[in-house]
Structure formats: structure tokens, C-alpha cells
UniProtKB/Swiss-Prot annotation:
It comes from Aspergillus niger (strain ATCC MYA-4892 / CBS 513.88 / FGSC A1513). This is Autophagy-related protein 9. Residues 23-54 have a biased composition (Basic and acidic residues). The lineage of its organism: Eukaryota, Fungi, Dikarya, Ascomycota, Pezizomycotina. The chain crosses the membrane at residues 240-260, 287-307, 542-562, 578-598. Belongs to the ATG9 family. Residues 456-476, 645-665 dip into the membrane without crossing it. Residues 71-80, 141-159 have a biased composition (Pro residues). PANTHER family: APG9 AUTOPHAGY 9 (PTHR13038), AUTOPHAGY-RELATED PROTEIN 9 (PTHR13038:SF10). It is a multi-pass membrane protein. The gene is atg9. Homotrimer; forms a homotrimer with a central pore that forms a path between the two membrane leaflets. Forms a homotrimer with a solvated central pore, which is connected laterally to the cytosol through the cavity within each protomer. Acts as a lipid scramblase that uses its central pore to function: the central pore opens laterally to accommodate lipid headgroups, thereby enabling lipid flipping and redistribution of lipids added to the outer leaflet of atg9-containing vesicles, thereby enabling growth into autophagosomes.
Amino acid sequence: MMTSNILSRFLPPNGSPSVYETIRQHDNHSDASDVEERAGMAFEDEHGDRFSDRELEDALADAGRDDSPGPSEPFLPRSPPTKRDEGGFLKAGSRRRKFSRSGRIHAASPRHKFDDSDDDVPPSLLVEGDQDDDDVLRSKLPPPPRSIDPPNVEPPPRPSPRDDRVHWEAARDRLPLHDTNRRAHHASLWSAGYPNLALVDPKEKALWMWANVENLDNFLKEVYTYFLGNGIWSILLNRVLSLLTFAFVVGFSIFLTNCIDYHKVRGSRTLDDILIQKCTKQMSMSATFLLWLLSFFWIGKAFQYLLDIRRLKHMHDFYHYLLGISDAEIQSISWQEVVSRLMTLRDSNPATAGAVSAKHRKFMGSQSKQRMDAHDIANRLMRKENYLIALINKDILDLTLPIPFLRNRQLFSRTLEWNINLCIMDYVFNEQGQVRTLFLKDTHRRALSEGLRRRFMFAGIMNIFVAPFIVVYFMMHYFFRYFNEYKKNPSQIGSRQYTPLAEWKFREFNELWHLFERRVNMSYPFASRYVDQFPKDKMVQFAGFVAFVSGALASVLALASVVDPELFLGFEITHDRTVLFYLGVFGSIWAVAQGLVPEETNVFDPEYALLEVINFTHYFPGHWKGRLHSDDVRKDFAVLYQMKIVIFLEEILSMIFTPFILWFSLPKCSDRLIDFFREFTVHVDGMGYLCSFAVFDFKKGTNVISQGDTGRRDAARQDLRADYFSTKDGKMLASYYGFLDNYGANPRSGHPSTKRQFHPPPTFPTLGSPSAIEMGNFGDRPAAAGLMGQQSTYGAAPRFGPAGMGDHLSPAPSMLLDPHHQPSASGFRSTHRANPYPRYRASRPPPTISDPIEDEDPPAGKGRSAVKSSPGVGSSGGGIGTSDSNLGESWRMNLVGDEVEEEDEGGENVDTLAGGGGVLGLIQQFQKVNQDNRGRTTVGI
């Protein structure tokens, strides 16, 4: 009875089909050529058209009635023989659905003429396929009737389903209505044209493979993986070394645990005295089974790597011959340049066999480009990752530990991340990498949710069996890798890094891994600076005392060993513990304690360091605002930035706690997960189904990111709806700005880039750095510009002018975006950020310390004019302010937008004259300051 109750939790109830069977049937019944169903990625020629049994029955009946040619048949036009080119390929193609369409029309109207060549595409515009397929079919079909059948002729009786099956088999043998082996046919043509692939020009072969790409997502992932691997030889070397590392860890661990007699170590002098002869024969059954299991795994990986060499060679040829990038150059070239060359290759080869279906080839034939610019490539590469970023940002996943004293603590490790991808992503996405359309309908919500719960349960059970082996391997690997490093530099034991959960919180939509890694790595010096200098006076005093005592003892022992090394090094201070042993112990204690004591010359300013971290990580929760100095913020940041040894211990413990999270925590949010994929998935023609947050509307710019229905009367309902359908902490806005920073600049159009450059952290804040009140306590985002906060006037021209403001080489603002993705003039004007912190913009320049103003949203008209009036109005910064008094009221400040509005009433716009910046703009600004303010307000330079 207990066994049946346990199984009933994992098995579906009686009489209801499995959710996997429903998904499989839905995928099989989906029309392969439907853009909405198959996301525009299906290739119709692979699947063929579906003919009903009635149509085939009518065709067979017509063929049986009139097998001999009619009196008028000799006068019918005959189709010419199929022509082939020199390579053995058919010259042109035609659509195969025309026969089924004409068959239906012919059955409904016998007077319909068979010739519908007016709907055909001219042969000169066709790219590939069989040109005369329809002519061949017409030659094999009976001639069309010349008169209407007599009205007294009764239709033949409908046969039984068994007869329908017989007719279907006969029709498939007699009438080649569809070539079911089209891919094999192309392979035979290729083999006939090129009998020996080794003799084919590698460039021609690479072009042929590029033209026959069927799954663009997988192909671009291979391109990106090859780019990250730095070429074929680096990838092969990495794989060989990984296999050798795995073999060494397993072999050395077995040697240490089974081949040494540790009882004989104390009295032995040589290694042979403690070795166990033929130790493998004396191993236990569990150790033997584990060794065989790991050996088979190693052999399987080696065999997989050998088979993958052919694919790597093809990718090498693609990079070398089509993109013009060698293995030596790939290590230093940027991804933006690779994207640019991919777009150039796409333009020179407009059609691929797998990306455009036969049904839409006529429409795509008039288009010179496909959906494959920087935005589309990022969406294809991060189709799944964008969903996971949104899930973590919106706190959909319940990652709390189901333990009474740890219920408020979240656990997210690499092991749990792998299980989430296995349980959720592999469940939602099909084999082609597209979202299953069944998840986009609310009709199967309950069944899909129950299926997801069962996947969590099953994954938890599997983790119980796999966890012991993984724990042992990772512990040995970590010990072998980091012990020598900690031995040489004991202070490294306190080094920190971001946790896996912090990385997913920091990562932005459509941000590839290497770009994210570069951005986060630049924040490490400032993060360490913040953690090290935060108030910890008690610990510093205690560490100083320990360092003093241990250093004194170590120095005395070291001095004695220098005086008489032969006698003193063998001297035992305690039983079997010599001076050399205690010298190592005291030296290690001194190094660790000294690492906890900060430098005496450090200036205490944790808010400044944390603001620098925020400028790189783009993570600034709302409850941190105005509280950067508090201990609560320090604790929140310490959870995201932990010591490496703690992260490793959490990884080991997560293998024990992951089953409990999969059993008790994640099943609670299965309904929300199914609703999330249904409500935050949009369809893009030619791209498929994407996360709605990852589809940037460049034409509207940042205006579209301010989500929420402003037309509703119920404010509470409006706020709830806006919060539900928007991201937290400005994630989408930061992603939009980050994407423009990475891909928006056109190096050939003369637009300067404002991407934040990395500089090592100074030992103390400079005099030009803003105060904590100025940067941390006011504004919606950290305000920083210029050097450390004052907006620099040099180079203050807007990064992007209106469309067409570039030089004559390329008027487009970005070379890596197609015309339909080019931001409009207003969209670019809204992204004028002439400071090195381009992603966070306050609604006003930073106030002075004595200006206790509150955050308020400016009117739409004023905010828009402020953005258009001066490039200096940005996230934060100094800008040009005017004082109403020269003496006691210098704390009052007018916004640049208000000042420009007043000038527009009686004079010309300065921005119009100066063109948004440059020397003329600087002169005009200095003249304005000297005339109106008598030189008291400064221009941040």
C-alpha cells in the first residue's frame, strides 16, 4: 500500500494521458511551415505536404478511369526534360504545395485549367530546388476533363479505412507526390558532383555548409563557442588537458586511498615500504565499481571529442575562409568584429537552406537581408539564458532552504543551476531550441504544472544517487588545485568572488558571457576595497595582536635557525615537532592575520567604493538608496560577494541540500513558472519565441521601457500590473543601455564611444569625487560623471546624434544593427550620456549638500526638453547650474532644461548653434556663465 502511494505521486492518474504524450502529439500535429507554430525556422521541403485520403482516392479513381491518352492529349503541351547544371544540381525550384492546391480546385471545378504558371516565380529569381517538379507531376497525371460530368453519374461509394490505407500505399508507390527523402537526394547530388570531399576546395565546402544551415541557433552557438575557445588548437588542447586532469584526479585519489599502508609510514624510510602490492585486486566492490564507471565515462568523453574534431575543422574553415579570421587572430579580435563579418557574409549570401521555408521563399526572395544582426544574434545565443535572468530578477524561483533554522537563506549553486536547466528549460524548449507552443496556451496549465512538479521530484531522487561521487571528485580536485596556492600565499584563503546567484542578478538581457565577465571582473578591485575598509575595528585590533605574537615567535625561530641551522632545525620544541614545523605554523598565522589588517594610509570611505561597484555591476536595489553606509547594506553585499572557500563549501553542501530544494521549495512555484513562460513570451517573425524583456524596441528607445498602463483609473491596480509586467531594479533599462554601449557605437561614423574604461582604484578618493550625500542619497540612480562625478565638458558631445549625423562613410548610428533595429533620432537623443556611467541617469543634476530636495518626477514636457536641450543632462552630473544670488542663496539651483526653455522664448537655442557640443558649445557655455553668474558657478571639466 505504501509503495502504491509513493508511485502515485510520480505517475499520472488513471485515464488521463501523460503530459509528455500531449506535448509529443502537439509537436507532431504542428504544421511544419506555420510561422507561428514553428517560429519560422522549419523547412517545408523536409516534412512535405499532407494529403488526405479522399484526395488520393480521387486521383487514383481518375487514373483508373482513363489510363490511355485521350484524343486531345497529343495537342497538350509537354513539359521539357529537367535540366541540370554542371555540378549535378537542379537549376531552380518551385513550390510543392501547388499540386495539392490545384488538386482541390480541380476536384471542385472540372473546368479549372491545369496551367497556373502565372503564380510561379520566374526561374531567374529562384535560388535552389527542383524547377520542373510540377511539370513532371503533370506528365504523370491523367489529363483534365474537357466537359462537365453528366449529372446522373453517382459518386463512388466511400471505401473503408482499410481501403484508404491500401489506396495511400498504392498512391505513394505510383505517384511521387512528395519526395520524402529530399535530404538524402541532396546528399547523393553532392556526392555525384564531388566524389571525393578531400579534393574539394575548403572555401567552396565552407560556402556550401553555410548555404545549407538548417538550425541557425545551433550554428551561431557553435560560432560563439569557437570564438570563446580561441580556435581549434586551443579547444583541442583544452579538451586533452581536461581529460588528463580527470584521469589524474581519479587515479591519484585511488592511489592515495587504496595503495598506501598508512600504518607503516612512521617507521618506514622508502616508498616501497608503505606501498601495497597489487592494490587494485584488494579494492572493495564499491571502489571497483566506481573506478569502472569513471573509466567508461572517460572513454566516452574521449570518443566524443574525437568525433567532434570534424565539426571543429568545419568551423575552422568557416572562420578562416568565409570570415577571414585565423586562429592567431581570433585570440585578439573582438566579438563585435565577428558580428560585423557575419553580417557581411549574410549580405553576400542572402539565403540559407534551413532558415527560409519553401512557402516563404517567394516573400524572402525580395528581401536582401535576414534577421541576423547583433540584436538577433544575441537573442538566438541567449534564448534560454534570458528567461533564467528574468526568473531570478522577478523572484519566481523559490530557492529557500526547507530547513527550520535556515528558511530565510537562499541557496543557488552550480549544481542547482544544472538541475534547473534540466527540469525547466529542457521541459519548456524542444529539440530545435524553440519554446513549445503548448506552454503558450492556458488550456494545459494544470497538466504542465503537474508534469513540472514530477520532474523536480525525479531530479531530486537522481541527485541522491549521483551526489556522493560528485562530492568526492570535487573535493579532491579542489584540494589538488588550491592547496599549493594557499601554502605559498596563506592570505589568499580570504580572497572573495561573486556567488553564482550574484552573477545571475548582475547579468543583463542579451549580454553574452564574455562581455558580462569583462564588466564584472572590472568591479573586483572596488568590491575588495569596499569589504576591506568597512568598519571592523574589533576584528582589526584582534588580528593585529595575533599578527604581533605570531610574528615575534616566527622571527625568533628564524633567527635561531640562521645562527646554527644544522643543530636548530632538527631541534624538537614538542614531541616529534621540530623548529621547522612551528616556523611554518607561525608564519601562516602571521600571514592570515596580517591580511586582515588594512593599510594605515587607507582613507575610510565605503560609500565611494560601493558606488564604484554599482557602476560596474549595475545592481542597485531600491532599499539601498540613502543607506550605503549602513551595516544592512554591507550584509546584503557580503551575501553576494563571499570568500572562495565559503563558496566551495556551499557547492559541496548544495549537493546534499539540492534534493530538498527540488522536493519542497521549487514545486511550490511550478504554477508561477508555467504562467511566466506564457505571459512573458513574444513571437518575432524569423526569430521564433523570445523572452519579452530581451526584445528591445530601438525605435521608441527608453520610452517603451517605462511599462505600465497609465490610462487606468485605479492607481493601485495600475501599480500592481506595472510591477508584474516590468523588471525589478531597472534591469531592462540597464540592459538596453548596456547593449547600446557594446554594439551601438559606429567606429566608422565618427561617434565617440562612452563605454566605461577600467582604471585601477586609487588609494583614496580624489578631491574631485562627489560626496556620499551627493551621489548615494539623492537620485534614482548613482550619479557619476567625468572623473568621479562632475560631468566633464570635454568630450561632452552626445554620443549619438540624429540619424545621418555620422560621417560620409556610414550614416547609420550602428554598423551592427539592421535598419529595422536602428534607433530613431529620439531614441538616440534619449541615450545621450557623456559620462563614463552611461546606464543610470538621474532626473536632475546632483544637488549640493545643503539642498534637501526630495525625489520627484518632472513633467513629461520638461523632462523631454531637458534631455534634448543639452548633452550634459544625464545621469548625474554636474551640468551647468545658475544661482539666483551671488551671496547667500548660492545653494539654489535651476535645471538646465528650465533655463533653456526660458531662452527659447526670447532667443536662439544654444544647442542648435553649438550642435550639441564641441568648441562652439564650450565657448557659448563659458560666455553664459560669465555674463549671468559672474563666474561663480563652475563648469565641470
